[in-house]
């Protein structure tokens, strides 16, 4: 279960048509749009072309989800394990921060703010924390405004696991304290540089903790997956990775593998969900 941070989604009214029109204007006059330093070359990581292992064939033989009252079994929506070839691409080294998102809002003049910001300002001393409580649409718009996109599931997973398909950035076994996740984590967002050991084989940071991340893709079965899952379809978008949690089954070690897959309505927003961007150039 995701950590919700709002009482009613309907309190936050969206007007994406006007927003996209605004962004279209900004794209047409790029000379007048200052670029955040988040988009300097050294802030994105080149993931080289090549094969990687995606998904898993693992099965939870103990039915852990039933013991804790969860609906979805572990791992099954990530079957089957397979090798995939991807061309090279770039991905943000860090999650998009409050300060970076604030700059985007100033440039776009979009007035729909993250729910926990007060008077248009992010919480004090949290400029370098990942921005949260943004919908998929807002995350997508941010990336688009900078000539990028949200990473696909494939891009996200390759960046997280490397060519060897590791379950954790540092290796095969979960090690407490290496990422902001679980009962020993901070149970709140932390600066994107706070956990230097949460570094993927490509040195992409924070993919296994701090916040879960929106991806570009709909929640669909992988090729070859025959599971009958009623939530599959073009209704929910995919969240990847783990984030801080305050309670619940996410404290269990079985739920901590770094490439975990979750689904959410693209109109919803959460206190432990953020995003990063990717690019082919």
Positions of PLM-derived features:
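Functional-site microenvironments in short loops/helix caps that host divalent-cation chemistry
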Residues: 47, 53, 57-68, 111-262, ...
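Bacterial N-terminal signal peptides
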Residues: 18-28
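A short glycine-rich, aromatic-capped structural motif
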Residues: 39-114, 134-135, 209
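Solvent-exposed residues in well-ordered beta-strands and their adjoining turns
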Residues: 24, 87, 278-280
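N-terminal secretory signal peptides that target proteins for export/translocation
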Residues: 1-12
